[in-house]
Amino acid sequence: MELRVERVEKNYERRLAVRYHDETAGRIYVVYGGCIFSMRTVGRDMSITMFGYRLRSPVMCALVSTELLQNRRGRGEAAAEPSVGGAGSPGADYLFTHHLGSASGEAPEDLVNTFDVNVRGLVLSKLFVGFPVPDGIVLRLGEVDEGTGVLRILAKPRAVNSVTGFVYHLDSASLDLTQAELYEVPQFLAKDIEDLLRMGELRRSPLRLSIPRTPVIVTGNRGLSTITVPSSRGRGGDRRRRRRNVTKMAGHVQIKMFRDERDGQQTETDAGRAEEEARHISGWSGGDHCRVEPCEVSHLRVWKVVSLIEVALAVRKGPLSWLGLAHKNPTDNLRAVLKGEARDVCEKLGPWTEIMGKSVLRPGPEMIYATVNYLLELGGLQSKFCIMEDLCNKYAAKHNIDVPNEAPPSDEMALIEELAVSILQKAAVVCEVLRFAAKAESENIAAVRNVVAPKQYGAASELLVHETSFLLNSARGGAFLGPEDDGRAATTRPLFKRAMARTDKKVSAILACIYLESRPSRIVGTILGGEDLVRALEEARLRIVDPWDKDDISAALRVLDSIVNFRLA
């Protein structure tokens, strides 16, 4: 995992505080014990996102928890509630590498701004490298590239003898790269939290223009687990947040997966295994895995994923799962999150509803979600397609599925294109209706306010009112303006909340009509009363011919992106 930042330094309480700032995202990053803590510098959201390796071995977790508890008792402190950032005694599900450092006797000051964690103890070292190491080992979990301004958590952490420098083979099953959502300030940040946030206001030298601004990137061939750390607040705390056990990926990052070719110090065994795996995984293209290729390869990518996504996202349970004893596959949590997102987005009324009922392909929510994510990737928008593609490649390799690498079957590809065209055409019509409604509010509000929608769409429209309000607010802000609007500003006419709610309800019925009808242009034009609108809607629909043409589908993609973001919020 890596992200581009700018180093910020400040003397604080007789020590040098080093933080990393992403001005574009409005976030400050702190490195602590091999983990990266991310905080917002603007807005009211005070939640903290942490990226790092979580301990997976039950024996290891028990040993670390015991050491943390003994350390606290030795200092005369009471046992603490779960605390990811502090030196307390967290639950076994919330132990990270910085807890490992605390258990080995490291002070918080020694863990700040370092990706190296000392592991002391024969049993712990054996759990990591397979045999006891009397000298102790150092886990090298990441690095800071000062030349390019990149913080990087290594896809393959290294275990190094703390005396001789000998590099051991690290058991990859002992650690799990995880995103944790925290709702309490970690103890090591609590002392300088105000000063930390002020660091975002410091005057910095301009960022080098040659360095492209990129989101957080996850590298390697394993997924990113997500958890929510329960609050330690007692009665009166936020129970809703304590109940959450599935966390979505952070909204300020985009996850992309590709093989990490920077880790050149891996052992010969690791290199051989990686080469063997690369030969088996079809369609793997190294660091360019998430780059959109020419048309034929693009067709092949989406065909592979749509063909395999349902089985690839199936969470497999062991024979003893009914007893609660089965060991979960490390990627099962990722599969569950993606499967849940597919259902949250695509099982509801949307641009895909009609095609799901009539297509020969019989697409399920997973197929629809994969297709939508691929379209979003084509448009350069935030997408989960690369994660899905990685899971499908692994599934094909594991089950010896022969996937062609040249051209997909033409009949199957035609069905996928039909699916993509249908979704985009519906989204294009929705875009025109939203633009029409936003414009009417500022010029001729009766054009929307006085329409009478057919009663058969009433029940369906009730489910879309809040989503329609979100889409209309985006349209009022100019999100869906096209080139023909000639730079027209967003709606400036003051609108009362009750009046806007009436418009939202009317438009939600129109959107339900678009989603349910095969040829909605004529019906919607009749409802809104205008042949010019019928013509505009039909032109927008028929403009979508090639679903892989980024220029033709740009307006429809903005609508799809807004729908997905609302339903996953």
From Swiss-Prot:
<keyword id="KW-1048">Host nucleus</keyword>
<dbReference type="GO" id="GO:0019033">
    <property type="term" value="C:viral tegument"/>
</dbReference>
<keyword id="KW-1035">Host cytoplasm</keyword>
<dbReference type="InterPro" id="IPR004936">
    <property type="entry name" value="Herpes_UL21"/>
</dbReference>
<dbReference type="Pfam" id="PF03252">
    <property type="entry name" value="Herpes_UL21"/>
</dbReference>
<dbReference type="GO" id="GO:0030430">
    <property type="term" value="C:host cell cytoplasm"/>
</dbReference>
<comment type="function">
    <text>May facilitate the viral transport through neural circuits.</text>
</comment>
<dbReference type="GO" id="GO:0042025">
    <property type="term" value="C:host cell nucleus"/>
</dbReference>
<keyword id="KW-0920">Virion tegument</keyword>
<protein>
    <recommendedName>
        <fullName>Tegument protein UL21</fullName>
    </recommendedName>
</protein>
<comment type="similarity">
    <text>Belongs to the alphaherpesvirinae HHV-1 UL21 protein family.</text>
</comment>
<keyword id="KW-0946">Virion</keyword>
<feature type="region of interest" description="Disordered">
    <location>
        <begin position="261"/>
        <end position="280"/>
    </location>
</feature>
